[in-house]
Regions:
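Short catalytic/ligand-binding loop motif for oxyanion handling, primarily in non-cytosolic enzymes
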Residues: 27-28, 62-63, 90-92, 119-122, ...
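Secreted/processed peptides and extracellular or luminal domains of membrane proteins
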Residues: 19, 23-26, 224, 279-282
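Structured loop/turn residues at beta-strand edges in well-structured enzyme cores
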Residues: 48, 106, 271-274
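Residue-level signal for mature regions of secreted extracellular proteins and peptides
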Residues: 6, 10-13, 211, 266-269
C-alpha cells in the first residue's frame, strides 16, 4: 500500500557525488514548478493512503522558496513532511538556524542531512554537522545519512551469504555509483542475482516523483507518467507482474530480467543492483516509458 511520496524537487545539485542514485549535479535539468508541486500533492491525496510527502533532489534547498511552499501546502493537506539535504547552506550556526527556522515553523516531521565524505570530504566541522547542531538546538526532528566508499568485508560465517563477498559502506550501485565506485570490488556470476534485495515492487510503500512526471519505483524504474495518468488510476490498475521490467524482477530478480530479454552482457557483477541497473540501461530504448528519465542513467 502506497503511504509515501518523495518529490525530487530538482535533479540539480551543488555537488556531483560519485554515489548519487540519480546522477544529480550542477548542470542537471528537471525542476518542479509550483503548479506541478500542487498537482503532484493533489494526486497523492486522491489515493487516500498516502500519509507523508518528502522533498529532496538533487538539492531542494537550491529552490528554497519552492521547497518551503511545497512543505506548507503538504502540511495544510495533512501530510507529514520531510526534507533531505546536504546542508551546503550551513556556513555558520547563525546561518544554519536562519535557514531552518521556517521549516520548524511549518512543522516538518523530519530533516535528513547527508553527512559523509562524499558530500563534505570527511571534515569534522562540515556544513552537515553545523546543520545537525542547529536543528537540535531548535528542536527540529533530524537525523544524518552517512554513506562510505564501498569496501570488501569478510563473508558471513553462516546463513545464505556464507562464503560470499560482503560489500560494506552503504552505497547502492545505481546511478553514478555504477560508473564511479565498482572498480576493484569482487564480482559474482550474474545467475546468482535472483531477487531484488531492496524494493517491494509488488506492493510499493513509497515512490519518487520527478518534474517530468515519472513515478519511480526505484530510481530510473517507472510505473508510468503522472502527467498522463493520474496516480490514483495508476496504482489502482498497477499489477507488477504485467510491468515489462518489474515482472521479470519479481519472477527471478535481475538474472531473470537478463534471461527474459536476451541481450549481451558481462558474466559477473558486484551485486544485484549493479546487474539490474546496467540491464535497464541496455533496455532504455526498448522501454522508454518505464525506464526514465535517461539522465538518471548518465545519458542525455
Amino acid at each position: 500500500m502506497l503511504t509515501g511520496v518523495h518529490l525530487l524537487l530538482s535533479y540539480k545539485c551543488d555537488s556531483e557525488c560519485d554515489h548519487c542514485f540519480v546522477y544529480s549535479g550542477p548542470q542537471a535539468k528537471g525542476t518542479f514548478t509550483l503548479a506541478q508541486v500542487k498537482e503532484a500533492l493533489n494526486q497523492a491525496a486522491e489515493i487516500g493512503t498516502v500519509k507523508s510527502a518528502y522533498f529532496e533532489g538533487g538539492e531542494p534547498f537550491l529552490f528554497y522558496p519552492l521547497m518551503l511552499e511545497g512543505v506548507r501546502i503538504a502540511r495544510n493537506m495533512g501530510f507529514k513532511t520531510g526534507v533531505v539535504t546536504n546542508a551546503y547552506w550551513a556556513t555558520s550556526q547563525d546561518d544554519a538556524q536562519l535557514w531552518l527556522r521556517p521549516l520548524l515553523d511549518l512543522g516538518i516531521s523530519d530533516l535528513s542531512i547527508s553527512d559523509d565524505a562524499f558530500h563534505h570530504g570527511g571534515k569534522d566541522a562540515s556544513p552537515a554537522r553545523r546543520a545537525l547542531e542547529a536543528a537540535r538546538k531548535l528542536g527540529l526532528p533530524c537525523g544524518s545519512i552517512s554513506i562510505e566508499q564501498p569496501s570488501l568485508e569478510e563473508g558471513a560465517s553462516d546463513g545464505p551469504s556464507r562464503g560470499k563477498p560482503v560489500i560494506a559502506g552503504g552505497a547502492v550501485l545505481r546511478g553514478r555509483a555504477v560508473d564511479k565506485l565498482v572498480a576493484g570490488l569482487p564480482r559474482r556470476p550474474w545467475q546468482e542475482f535472483t531477487e531484488c534485495p531492496h524494493e517491494d515492487l509488488a506492493d510499493p510503500a513509497r515512490v519518487h516523483l520527478d518534474s517530468y512526471g515519472n513515478v519511480h519505483l526505484c530510481q530510473g524504474l517507472s510505473t508510468g507518467n503522472m502527467w498522463q495518468v493520474r496516480l490514483s488510476q495508476m496504482f489502482g490498475d498497477y499489477a507488477a507482474e504485467r510491468h515489462p521490467i518489474c515482472g521479470p524482477l519479481l519472477q527471478g530478480g535481475p538474472a531473470r530480467l537478463v534471461a527474459e530479454y536476451e541481450f549481451k552482457h558481462e558474466d559477473e557483477y558486484v551485486d544485484a543492483c549493479h546487474l539490474c541497473y546496467l540491464a535497464r540501461r541496455t533496455l532504455l530504448d526498448r522501454f522508454p516509458q518505464y525506464l526514465a528519465p535517461r539522465q538518471v542513467y548518465g545519458l542525455e
